[in-house]
Design a protein with these regions (language model features):
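PP2C/PPM-type serine/threonine phosphatase catalytic domain
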Residues: 1-265
Length: 265
């Protein structure tokens, strides 16, 4: 079994966080799930899919499995890891990467036991805040943004057919993108394949930064500039989360909407 990477010094910068989720105005069920775990300094959004409530099951399983893996590691750092660690990654990055793989294993095992859920899956985006760096892992089109000063920067690149189209044809207009028939089809998710390879990003931790972790029900309805304005002008994170949800619903609320905000320092 693989060994555990060595842990670093204790974290010093405090965090504040909140998370809200809403079914939106055009869906009866909410298949999004989120977790805001201050003790583990872990923040997750998952957007389920699969029908027959399977999407809701998959998204909740993903959040629970990843948080449980973090909690288990911190309780016993010497235990064997269930997947191979990457010696080039930090502890935080390995925890996220392996935790996402564990979540994928659990979703696939559950799907095999219930034929009604054999097509269930979920996107995932997870943010882990360490002592000196922030690590993001994701699969699918749920996103992580970072507000630093006046700049709201998207830190994740969607795993979706439309994102691949935009990369191949950067001249595509907003109208062409909106009319693209497969714009909601993701190319990477939990549950769809035996192995999942989450995209990883690591950046230095800076006090004053605010991170937004969200499902496509938010970013697909609310322009980045409007999201930035809400976060910058609303210091109270609970109020800012509610305003983000409200903005998506005011734009028609075509999908489930989830937003988690995390302030550093």
């Amino acid at each position: 079994m693989p060994g555990s990477p060595a842990s670093g010094p204790a974290t010093t910068l405090p965090l504040a966080a909140c998370g809200f989720s809403h079914a939106g105005r055009q869906r009866e069920e909410n298949e999004d799930a989120f977790g805001s775990f201050l003790d583990e300094r872990l923040f997750i959004v998952a957007d389920g899919m699969g029908g027959h409530n399977a999407g809701e099951v998959a998204s909740v399983m993903a959040v629970d499995a990843l948080e449980t893996f973090f909690r288990s590691y911190h309780a016993d750092p010497r235990q064997p890891w269930p997947h191979q660690v990457d010696s080039e990654l930090s502890l935080g990055a390995n925890l996220l990467r392996v935790g996402v793989k564990v979540a994928n294993d659990k979703i696939r095992a559950a799907a095999k036991q219930d034929r009604a859920k054999n097509r269930m899956g979920t996107t995932i985006v997870a943010l882990a805040v360490g002592d000196a760096q922030v690590t993001v892992a994701h699969a699918g089109d749920s996103r992580c943004y970072r507000l630093r000063g006046d700049e709201l920067k998207r830190l994740t690149r969607d795993h979706s057919i439309v994102e691949e189209m935009i990369a191949a044809r950067p001249e595509m207009t907003d109208a062409e993108i909106a009319a693209f028939a497969h714009r909601n089809v993701v190319t990477r998710s939990l549950g769809s394949k035996e192995e999942v390879d989450p995209a990883m990003l690591v950046e230095p931790l800076e006090g004053g930064d605010v991170y937004l972790v969200c499902s496509d029900g938010l970013w697909g309805s609310v322009p980045d500039e409007k999201m930035k304005g809400i976060i910058r002008s609303t210091p109270d994170l609970d109020a800012a989360c509610q305003l983000l949800i409200d903005a998506a619903n005011e734009a028609g609320g075509p999908d489930n909407i989830t937003a988690v905000l995390v302030r550093v320092g």
